[in-house]
């Protein structure tokens, strides 16, 4: 019941937002048009706080490390097919969880009877891996067809981690290049600092909570980059528009006006994402827990804060608007 309510609220907000964008209903205004929060006053606190949190996150990473999942530690991979019909994932998870094999992940793919099983590497070499596979076969019985059985070693897992890290770095570089061409180099640098800030703090969160770091975590980090960039670009686009219109407005006032004018959109977006992630976090099960927990922290808690209190005020320190000259353009009635 709770899951249905949360998902229903998220869908309702999305529908209202789309209808308002296309003019079917009046534009949604979560905050009044004359809102004038002085966000730039907080930059004297946000930058030192973020610097301290970043140092703490890096320290936690080197002290505690990450709790690597099967994808990066190695282990066993079994592809099975239920002969009698659709596979019961919950039943299979209970059966395999009682074998004492450590981390066991199940994923349905292809048809409803196909299941991919990942089991953590067992201490004791190849003999221990084969013994674990035999335990699984005995537990699942004769009604299962084993279509693939593989043992993934540390070398392959290390390559996956390296490829994931390279992919993350290439995404950040791609974002930098994109913003450099769309805006100015100061905007690109500000967005890159904000994105790196989000990723570092999220990795620190994963280190302190010791939730599994696997391929879904890499996907979560890339998604966080996308959400953070999207929010930042919306604010930057409004800043660029106001820079062209108001040649004499002080930079702090201009940044405040830009953030205030996009505040309704930011609130609606993040409330919708929060409701969807909350439903997944509470009812999605263990299989996607790492992904949803990481997203909840990175998008909802860190991403929103970064776009407003890091990415925007960073432009002041990078000298954006310092060389403006001319008269303000008249505002259309």
Question: Language-model features: where?
Answer:
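A structural signal for conserved, well-ordered secondary-structure elements
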Residues: 1-333
């Amino acid at each position: 019941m709770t899951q249905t309510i949360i998902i229903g609220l998220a869908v309702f907000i999305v529908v209202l937002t789309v209808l308002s964008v296309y003019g079917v209903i009046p534009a949604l205004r979560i905050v009044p048009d004359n809102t004038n929060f002085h966000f730039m006053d907080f930059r004297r606190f946000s930058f030192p706080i973020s610097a301290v949190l970043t140092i703490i996150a890096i320290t936690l990473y080197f002290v505690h490390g990450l709790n690597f999942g099967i994808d990066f530690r190695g282990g066993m991979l079994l592809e099975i097919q239920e002969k009698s019909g659709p596979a019961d994932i919950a039943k299979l998870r209970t059966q395999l969880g009682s074998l004492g094999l450590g981390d066991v992940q199940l994923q349905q793919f292809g048809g409803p009877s196909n299941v991919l099983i990942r089991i953590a590497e067992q201490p004791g070499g190849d003999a221990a891996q084969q013994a674990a596979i035999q335990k699984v076969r005995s537990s699942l019985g004769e009604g299962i067809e084993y279509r693939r059985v593989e043992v993934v070693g540390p070398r392959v897992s290390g390559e996956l981690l390296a490829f994931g890290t390279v992919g993350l770095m290439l995404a950040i570089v791609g974002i930098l290049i994109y913003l450099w061409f769309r805006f100015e180099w100061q905007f690109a640098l500000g967005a890159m600092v904000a994105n790196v800030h989000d990723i570092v703090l999220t990795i620190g969160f994963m280190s302190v909570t010791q939730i599994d770091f696997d391929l879904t975590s890499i996907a979560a980090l890339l998604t966080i980059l996308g959400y953070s960039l999207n929010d930042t670009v919306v604010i930057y686009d409004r800043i660029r528009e106001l820079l062209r219109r108001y040649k004499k407005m002080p930079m702090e006032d201009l940044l405040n006006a830009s953030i205030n004018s996009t505040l309704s959109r930011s609130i609606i977006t993040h409330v919708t994402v929060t409701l969807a992630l909350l439903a997944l976090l509470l009812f999605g099960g263990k299989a996607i827990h790492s992904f949803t927990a990481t997203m909840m922290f990175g998008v909802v808690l860190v991403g929103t804060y970064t776009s407003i209190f890091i990415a925007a005020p960073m432009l002041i320190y990078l000298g954006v608007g310092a060389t403006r000259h001319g008269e303000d353009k008249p505002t259309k009635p």
